[in-house]
Structure formats: structure tokens, C-alpha cells
Regions:
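Terminal alpha-helical anchor/extension segments at protein ends
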Residues: 1-174
Length: 174
């Protein structure tokens, strides 16, 4: 029954799924679920019925952090593989242009990276005042949106993880 309820979420969302329940119930769910590949983590702990969302979040959060750490590592490794295949763009100027063309498979960006700029087609002009007319206050956010709307994936990594790539990198589809 729970697996049926999960169908709607899994078919419409791309986010992770975490299973929370006693060891026995979590194991039974995993054995019966059609969605095992979407399960990002299991928290083997029971909670009283009617527990608050805040309490559930506190219990599940360590598993979410573990999953995010694994995703960051996987994204960095995927970028390294793309270097060998000559399918990697780095730095906001190159990434901006290729993302607009729909070539992004995986965008990896440092979590606090933001940049105000004026967009002129494929080119970006950095600005001092993010409130000036015609300025995009955060072109990094625009790149993220562009990659996602064109079916690409996005991974946010810790600051300093992409220093050699100017804080942003794009694995190309072709």
C-alpha cells in the first residue's frame, strides 16, 4: 500500500526517497517495493504514530547528509571521467554558453557561488551593481535552471571543491 502511494511521487519528482521504520518493517518494504532503485537511504528506527514533521526531519537528517556527501563525491568523479572524454566545460563563461545550448548532462556548482552579470546571448558581462538595469542578479541560478529544464542533472558541492574549475563545471552530453 505504501509502495502504491509512492508511485505518484516517484513518477513526478526527481528527489531522493528515504525509508523510515523499524528494521523489520523497512526490510519488508524494501523487499516488496518496485522503487528500490530510488531509495537513497534507510533509517531503521520507529517513531510514534502522529509524530511531527519536524521530529521526522531530525531523525532522517543524518541519512540525508550521508546521501548528499555520496552524491557530491559521485559528481566530482563523474567530472573527472568527463575530462578524459573531453566532455567538460569549466568556468561560468563557458558553462553559461553551453547550458543555454542544452548541452549540459551534469552541472556541478559550489554551494555559495553566485554572480551578477549582464547576459548578451552567449556572453556574460560581469557587473558591479547587481541592481543595475538589465542585470541578472545570479547567473549561476539561471544556469542551474537552464540545465534542469533541458533534462540535465545538478549537483551542489561544498565550497572549495571546484577551485581548479572556477567553482562551476558542466559535463557535456556531446
Amino acid at each position: 500500500e505504501v509502495d502504491l502511494g509512492l508511485d505518484e511521487y516517484v513518477n513526478g519528482a526527481t528527489g531522493p526517497v528515504f525509508v523510515l521504520g523499524t528494521r523489520e518493517r523497512a526490510a519488508a518494504f524494501l523487499a516488496a517495493s518496485r522503487h528500490r532503485r530510488r531509495i537513497a537511504g534507510v533509517v531503521a528506527r520507529g517513531l510514534p504514530a502522529g509524530e511531527s514533521v519536524a521530529q521526522v526531519a531530525r531523525v532522517v537528517w543524518p541519512a540525508v547528509e550521508d546521501w548528499m556527501g555520496r552524491r557530491q563525491e559521485e559528481a566530482i568523479l563523474e567530472l573527472e571521467d568527463a575530462v578524459g572524454a573531453r566532455r567538460l566545460a569549466a568556468g561560468i563563461d563557458e558553462v553559461w554558453s553551453l547550458a543555454q545550448d542544452g548541452r549540459g548532462d551534469l552541472l556541478v556548482v559550489e554551494e555559495s557561488y553566485a554572480l551578477a552579470a549582464r547576459a548578451d546571448g552567449d556572453r556574460l558581462e560581469r557587473v558591479v551593481d547587481p541592481r543595475a538595469p538589465g542585470v541578472v542578479d545570479d547567473v549561476v541560478d539561471e544556469v542551474i535552471e537552464s540545465v534542469m529544464t533541458r533534462g540535465g542533472r545538478v549537483a551542489i558541492v561544498a565550497d572549495g571543491s571546484l577551485e581548479e574549475r572556477d567553482r562551476i563545471a558542466l559535463k557535456l552530453r556531446y
